[in-house]
């Protein structure tokens, strides 16, 4: 059977730097036009080059909304397993990794973290994701949730095996009430709870708000023990994040991986190419995958099944579609005609979102980052 997603290489274009781009990409593990992407993070917090192929350490697994390194990210937070000590600092918790121990697909990511002897796997839906951690035998296994800097909140709820929090990190131009609310549920009870604010870890303190906060939860693990984490987020509220978590349903990890693969194949199989060699197939479908990431969905489905969105223009929750993170002065030439041709029903939703942008801001965008409206006279 035709399996075009297996030609996609999300690592293509990641050997880039500020000085020299070979694509300025990161491995966006995502669904087509998903509200949230996930990426392994090799760069320091706030670095636009968040994953670089030549790096040898991973600092965390980050929910990201970044369209380019120049525009940078917003609402991001990171998750990282560690063993031994509850290290939360981004440098101290980082682990060596090798590309030989890494699998990157559009719909699935797996890596062996050598320093911690932990295998991390993740698979996303539009607004949620599931992690599968395989731990070694250790009295002190931990998972760090880093809500990052520029204003964040964290709360550990051990009786529900849950962590909630929000990030207000952004690149400017946001309404005062901007937050990315996240909810994380684990399938193993905690035997250790701590939160950190800035550079200080407080064991037993379950809630913190500061410039840079996060949480560390821990437990004893057996060799090969698997711990799952369900993650969802919302730009509207914690309650909406819990609704978005329902995208995962009762599916297990492997079922979600297969569903993600099926969705990508459904979209990518709209074009079947002939002739050429394997490298050309990989190039074509990797670029096709990149063409189906942005503009991303910035809308959510509420408890009544209605399409709603947090407006990055006036801070209100309003009905209707919203898409973002695309530079129209680049994408009007080819991307939008292509989407109109190949995915007219999705392009219609994007155009409705453009009308909503005009209603809420008074302008059509030229470079629409959800939180920044860039327009030139």
Residue map of PLM features:
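Accessory carbohydrate-recognition regions in carbohydrate-active enzymes
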Residues: 1-336, 340-371, 375
């Amino acid at each position: 059977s035709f399996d075009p997603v297996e030609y996609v290489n999300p690592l293509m274009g990641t050997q880039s730097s500020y000085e020299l781009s070979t694509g300025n990409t990161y491995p966006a593990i995502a669904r087509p036009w998903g509200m949230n992407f996930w990426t392994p993070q090799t760069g320091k917090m706030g670095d636009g080059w968040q994953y670089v192929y030549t790096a040898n350490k991973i600092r965390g697994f980050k929910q990201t909304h970044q369209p380019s390194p120049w525009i940078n990210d917003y609402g991001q937070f990171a998750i990282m397993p560690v063993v031994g000590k509850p290290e939360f600092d981004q440098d101290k918790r980082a682990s060596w990794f090798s590309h030989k121990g890494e699998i990157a697909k559009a719909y699935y990511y797996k890596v062996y973290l050598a320093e911690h002897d932990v295998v991390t796997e993740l698979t996303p839906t539009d607004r949620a994701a599931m992690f599968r951690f395989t731990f070694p035998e250790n009295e002190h296994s931990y998972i760090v949730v880093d809500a990052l800097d520029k204003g964040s909140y964290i709360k550990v709820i051990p009786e529900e095996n849950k962590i909630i929090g929000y990030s207000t990190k952004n690149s400017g131009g946001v309404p005062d009430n901007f937050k990315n609310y996240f909810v994380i549920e684990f399938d193993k009870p905690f035997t250790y709870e701590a939160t950190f604010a800035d550079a200080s870890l407080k064991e037993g303190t379950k809630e913190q708000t500061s410039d840079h906060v996060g949480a560390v939860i821990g437990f004893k693990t057996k060799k090969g023990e698997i711990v799952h984490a369900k993650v969802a987020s919302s730009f509207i509220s914690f309650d909406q994040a819990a609704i978005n978590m329902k995208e995962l349903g009762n599916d297990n990890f492997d079922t979600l991986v297969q569903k993600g693969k099926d969705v990508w194949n459904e979209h990518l199989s709209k074009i079947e190419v002939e002739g050429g060699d394997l490298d050309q197939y990989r190039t074509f479908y990797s670029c096709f995958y990149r063409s189906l990431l942005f503009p991303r969905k910035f809308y959510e489905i509420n408890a009544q099944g209605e399409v709603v969105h947090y407006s990055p223009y006036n801070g209100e929750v309003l009905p209707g579609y919203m898409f973002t993170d695309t530079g129209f002065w680049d994408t009007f030439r080819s991307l939008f005609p292509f989407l109109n041709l190949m995915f007219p029903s999705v392009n219609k939703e994007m155009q409705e979102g453009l009308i909503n942008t005009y209603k809420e801001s008074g302008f059509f965008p030229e470079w629409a980052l959800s939180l920044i409206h860039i327009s030139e006279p």
